[in-house]
């Protein structure tokens, strides 16, 4: 019987062709991903004058496309045409206490200093803030590790702030509300939301508006992680429970309820309803 003409006998080139096809299938998704990634994320190198030391703590764009930059040294700089070859730098604010976060809303910048959320407004439109308004403040013990982060705006205009624990050889909360996530309104009302935080430097919303925060490895935190936070949650480090018995605390878990012993977090969560295990662990 004659072989159909459309059937081609396999030869030694089949293995080469198979390997080529496999390689092509591996490359195509990578190429497509690279193309789509570039649509959303692009690295811009901004030239900085030698006379300015930024040590960036926060970034926020104005409605006009200017870039606000808060610095660890206590300043906020405003960059006009930030992606051009020669952006114009103007010192918008100074004299702040280590502002680690910046947001822009309704014509004003908001930043979180070590001890307060501050609203910075340029009333006379000269490019420099002439009003520094304290929205809400909290106590400090003076410990070097009491960093404060934010704010992050909610759709209704309320702000979220996270407060680092102090460090005395281990994480501690010597003053309210260290180790907590706080919600603060524009008129200065504060609501404690969640605790168990150690060094919560980064947080944001997912596509559904749910809040997640990134945690830094350390005591009670075996490895870096991302955790979904809701009101009344306990994220694992017990130091912030020093303030769980305050009248406005959303949870009543006590520090003594968390044994200082070997154990796995998800096992503790079976018996402690407010404990929130991480969504993602980082190696």
Q: Where are the model-predicted features located?
A:
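Beta-propeller domains with acidic blade repeats across secreted/periplasmic ectodomains
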Residues: 35-283
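Bacterial Sec-dependent N-terminal signal peptides
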Residues: 4-35
């Amino acid at each position: 019987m004659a072989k159909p003409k459309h059937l081609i006998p396999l030869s030694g080139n089949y293995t080469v062709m198979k390997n080529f096809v496999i390689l092509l299938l591996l490359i195509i998704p990578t190429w497509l991903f690279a193309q789509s990634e570039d649509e959303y994320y692009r690295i811009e190198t901004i030239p900085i004058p030698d006379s300015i030391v930024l040590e960036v703590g926060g970034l926020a764009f104005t409605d006009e496309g200017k870039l606000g930059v808060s610095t660890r040294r206590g300043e906020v700089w405003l960059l006009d045409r930030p992606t051009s070859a020669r952006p114009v730098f103007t010192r918008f604010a100074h004299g702040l206490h280590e502002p680690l976060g910046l947001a822009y809303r309704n014509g004003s910048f908001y930043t979180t200093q070590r001890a307060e959320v501050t609203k910075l407004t340029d009333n006379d439109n000269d490019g420099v803030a002439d009003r520094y308004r304290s929205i809400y403040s909290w106590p400090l013990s003076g410990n070097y590790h009491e960093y404060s982060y934010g704010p992050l705006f909610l759709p209704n205009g309320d702000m979220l702030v996270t407060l680092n624990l102090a460090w005395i050889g281990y994480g501690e909360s010597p003053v309210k509300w260290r180790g907590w996530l706080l919600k603060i309104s524009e008129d200065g009302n504060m609501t404690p939301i969640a605790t168990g935080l150690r060094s919560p430097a980064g947080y944001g919303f997912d596509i559904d508006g749910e809040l997640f925060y990134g945690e830094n490895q350390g005591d009670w935190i075996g490895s870096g992680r991302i955790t979904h936070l809701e009101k009344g949650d306990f994220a694992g480090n017990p130091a912030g429970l020093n303030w769980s018995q305050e009248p406005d605390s959303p949870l009543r878990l006590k520090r003594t309820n968390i044994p200082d012993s070997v154990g796995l977090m998800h096992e503790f969560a079976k018996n402690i309803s407010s404990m929130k295990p991480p969504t993602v662990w980082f190696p």
